[in-house]
Amino acid sequence: MFTSDIAIFLLGLIAAIFGGYFGAAIGGNFAFTLTGFMILFSWGIFAVGGSDIGFNYVAFGPVMGPHITFAAGVAGAAYAMHKGLIESGRDATSPLARLGRLDVLLVGAAFGAFGYLFNIGLSFIPWFGSHIDTVALTVFTSNVLARLIWGNGLLSPQNYNKGATSFMKKIAPNDTYFWLRYQEKPGQYLPLGFSAGGMAAAVS
């Protein structure tokens, strides 16, 4: 029997497919930025009408949730690197629409659908689903899945620092493999985190 719950579920799935396609098209980081704006927009809806639909359906839902759009951008980048279309799968910033490849964006759409379904599945797990951030865990799981499918395994031993004796030294950033050089040391990221947290606390 076709019920309203089924209709809402299918509508969400369709939205997630489009959201994943869009997230891959504009790039994961830009998609995540839009999620932030959608959160502000959702607060406006809540303040005016008391409705949380903006949070549940848009900002953290199938439209612009990070488990949909950001995760899709990451998966699309991993696939594009595997196909030799971009240099690094870590590039979650560049819009993938610039590649002109439909298959890359369809990967994003597929991971958008995966994020939607996996997040719902987590929420139905007794106790566990109500005591964790299912959206964050879905993002993590989606990214690991993309790595396993299109990366060189979960880890890349061939890229370890040669001569290192401990695991942490083997995977330590070097001149070839790094994320943000200006945020690698505690003296760099701790003051930044403290000041950003203090600023947010002052506004609150």
What residue spans do the PLM features occupy?
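Membrane-helix interface and helix-disruption motif detector
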Residues: M1-I6, G50-P62, A92, L117-A136, ...
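N-terminal signal-anchor module of multipass membrane proteins
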Residues: M1-V63
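Hydrophobic core segments of alpha-helical transmembrane domains in multi-pass membrane transport
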Residues: A15-Y21, I39-W43, A71-A78, G108-I120, ...
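Transmembrane helix-loop junctions in multi-pass membrane proteins
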Residues: I26, G44-Y57, Y79-I86, F114-P126, ...
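Membrane helical hairpin/interfacial module
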Residues: T35-I39, G50-A92
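Membrane-interface helix-loop-helix junctions at boundaries between adjacent transmembrane segments
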Residues: L85-T165
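Membrane-water interface at loop-to-transmembrane-helix junctions
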Residues: R98-D103, T165-S204
